[in-house]
């Protein structure tokens, strides 16, 4: 459906917003159901239509200065029907990125122009999935269900901690008795009894402490395994656009933040929190000994807290800077190792080394600033501790001299105060770890809170036959990016061999990405056997589509495992048959290990042509009903290409084949050749038919290659 009429702008906007939330839309069906008079959707009809798509839509009135706090994109509703979509706001520059429904293109508006168009009415739109996602986002609250799940283990840890605190409470009392009773009365028999009892208490304390550490480490390890498994599953479920918009090093750096969370969970910080919980009991006993000395200890706590509150924001900023520098280093390292052949071929090692040295210096400098600040924080805590110790000693001595406190009671009080202050000091000293794990949770949340490809509610349709239809396709990779495909209409019949040619950047490969459902078009539908791919389960679809790219990646496994990657239990006969069709069987047979040869990382142990033939065999082995060759033979030598072309009739038999190529000789025998230019189909026909038009783009490209 084409949205050129002004009264259809509301329906067009709903289509775009629904597709933004990965919800398939049939515009004709919505128009038939909700636009009964053919005059466009009014506000009530628009909200009902949104509700029918399971979108949560709500009309609000907002002043311009409050727009920075709303969730975007949102529809700006105008009474004259000239609605537009607000996608982004730059508060500092006072600029607004909108999607113009009239021109089908993004526009950047200055403040004055936006004010002239904005009438104060907005429709906020969210999907149920996004609302659930926000409620279930990954942050510190994610660990609460995990704690509840393992509550039995944590209760056991709590019970052990209670006994440890009881022993910690008994030990000072033993010392008090020894100082005040045994030494004064020279009670050797009492001393022996107390010594044996103290030894038993110490032994139990050591055993229980070790048991608590073991139980706690065991439970946190389980949580760590769950988090790691969830992270990897989520990472693989992310859409292809997530990886295309981020550097590999950034993603790797975020995944490595799991190590920081693991160290925090298995460290002493959380057990210190348990110890701190029992401080109230110790305070009660200390108050019984001496209210004055207890007030000194209590008075020190705000200083510990104040110092931590003061240092935390600065530490967090420096940790952010350290992470950013580390991510830059990770990205540069991955890029350098991946492009090592290019670096050596161009002899640019000195330039790369110089860049690395600068980035490494920035990272080390950022790390040094973090360490320096952390040291200052720890020394501040130690200073407060020493001051409190001096005051306690001075005041305690006065109380002993005045007869208000015995020497044994003073020693016992100091031991009890140590039990209270020790976890406080440990927590204060571990504040850097807490700040670091907070950064790690945020960084990891960038991965875990990113929406995955939507599978829920998607249809797993029957085995596909191979009919493909592009209907009024308009597509761009980002809302503010140029249009890649514009008004593309194309029907491909089952079993047809289609060649697609055109200049670089004309949108050839983008068509195949839409077939694989890596993206959903901004407007229009991609249909396979009449089924809208926006409604289809991506995994169901991709299992039935074979794809061979210009640069294919092999995994560090055997040739057999690479060919049978989608079905490891596949019979050897099928693997060999696919390899023969791809022209790979002969060179594989000549290898010492044959099909069991390990190809190395990314297939480094093979030549480019050999890697490509294995990739073709991998695409053929599952007998896909749709086969896509995206410049698949451009990296082959002439002999290998000749083998592939010789087998092409057998390869294409019983399936729909799409061949994207710059070399026109590759597609000249196709049933139909599609010629693309600037995102549109400008010509189509057989090889001879297209050559017959001297003014056509195909004829022009053929002439260039003939020369």
Swiss-Prot record:
ATP binds at residues 502-509. Belongs to the ABC transporter superfamily. Protein-1 exporter (TC 3.A.1.109) family. It is found in: Cell membrane. The keyword Transferase does not apply. Residues 1-125 form the Peptidase C39 domain. Keywords: ATP-binding, Cell membrane, Cytolysis, Hemolysis, Membrane, Nucleotide-binding, Transmembrane, Transmembrane helix, Transport. The keyword Hydrolase does not apply. GO terms for cellular component: plasma membrane; type I protein secretion system complex. The chain crosses the membrane at residues 158-178, 188-208, 295-315, 387-407, 410-430. The gene is apxIB. The sequence shown is that of serotype 9. In strain CM15 (serotype 1), disruption of this gene prevents production of both RTX-I and RTX-II toxin, and no hemolytic activity in mice or pigs. GO terms for biological process: killing of cells of another organism; protein secretion by the type I secretion system; proteolysis. Residues 154-436 form the ABC transmembrane type-1 domain. It is a multi-pass membrane protein. Gene3D superfamilies: ABC transporter type 1, transmembrane domain (1.20.1560.10), Cysteine proteinases (3.90.70.10), P-loop containing nucleotide triphosphate hydrolases (3.40.50.300). This is Toxin RTX-I translocation ATP-binding protein. PROSITE patterns: ABC_TM1F (PS50929), ABC_TRANSPORTER_1 (PS00211), ABC_TRANSPORTER_2 (PS50893), PEPTIDASE_C39 (PS50990). Changing residue 517 to V: In strain: Serotype 5. Disulfide bonds: none annotated. Residues 468-703 form the ABC transporter domain. InterPro entries: AAA+_ATPase (IPR003593), ABC1_TM_dom (IPR011527), ABC1_TM_sf (IPR036640), ABC_transporter-like_ATP-bd (IPR003439), ABC_transporter-like_CS (IPR017871), ATPase_T1SS_HlyB (IPR010132), P-loop_NTPase (IPR027417), Peptidase_C39 (IPR005074). Homodimer. Involved in the transport of the toxin RTX-I as well as that of RTX-II. The active site is at residue 83.
